[in-house]
Amino acid sequence: MGISPDYGDTPLSGDELDALLPTVAELLGATKDKSALYDFEQAIHVNVAQKLMDDAINGRLAVESIVTERFIRDLHRELYGEIWTWAGAFRRHEINLGVAPEQILTETASGLDTLLYRWRNTADWNSRPFGIGVHAEILRIHPFADGNGRTSCLMADLVFLSTQDTDSLYLYEWRIDKPRYISLLREYDRHRNPRFLAEFIPIRSLVD
């Protein structure tokens, strides 16, 4: 499901209100706070995740199709296209996270290609660090104006599901200690090795 924020009754900012689709703004009515919007986003996320996970489990969605720049944009659009004008579009402005906007396309494509190449051509990885590597690489780049966390968590689960070769299937458990998680993400940014982050993030049975 991703790592849940604690919004409370925090109101949407002016920029956020401007980026809402008119139909969503009308649906929210006078109570335009982040908590209500998060619930709406989460309902869409559950539906999208269930369909794509089923496709990954049943072989209709191969890892070669998931670990691509095109897929991540399409996934972001599916998750947010009913709510936000920026869904599926790479960010165009500098922020204090990620790479420069003009580098996003190249960094996303090359970063995912590198991870997929390592998965195909080395024997020192299994499914668990592969999925976490995809998650961490997306967050390193921070390609979207918003929604990077939820998108990268679902990408990780899809990669994990599509590459497991066992009778029992597992997902990542995203309810984790946030300070340690953020510290390990920063370490990944320096050395680009997902092993330590993969060891930290637990897994759970798909049927739990």
Over which residues does each language-model region extend?
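FIC/Doc superfamily catalytic core
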Residues: 1-208
